[in-house]
Amino acid sequence: THPGVTVATLPLSDGGEGFGTCCVDACKGDILYTNAVDLYGNAIQAPLYTWGDTALIECAATCALQTKKDIMAASSYGVGMQLKNAIDLGFHHFIIGLGGSGMCDGGAGALAALGVAFYDRNGTAIPHPTGGDLQRIERLQIPSDFQHCVKCMHFTYACDVTNPYTGENGAAAVFGPQKGAT
């Protein structure tokens, strides 16, 4: 302690582990727990951080990197389940913290949880797309009300990198190995 010195805290996060708690503390929000699945489809209670009309989903809490690393079997489906839960609860602004996730499916799993249907070249449905299914996806079908539903919503994605998804410096090439890609 030093006389005349004032200490102020400033919550900061890179969009990974702890992002939701950081934001909910700074915004004086609440934490709700919703039914979801982890990146391998196991049922979990995942935190949904909320304040005002905002719901924050922390991928590091829902689909976190795990000891078992199987990027081909990992999916963002649980993130989509949380989005659906938040939509059903009436939220319109969504912040998704992308850091610390264990999947690399381009969001296909999350879209499937929101009703987008994915099919392979034989017309066979791929109900819960994973990273390994991306090469099999030939066609997708977006529900007729999907575009109307998302028109009134605002999405913010929080991360500390600017990598595109594909290419030499893409997220798949750069971050895939930490998630189990070889």
Enumerate the language-model features and the residues they cover.
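Catalytic cores of large soluble enzymes that bind and process phosphate-bearing ligands
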Residues: 11, 15, 71-75, 178-181
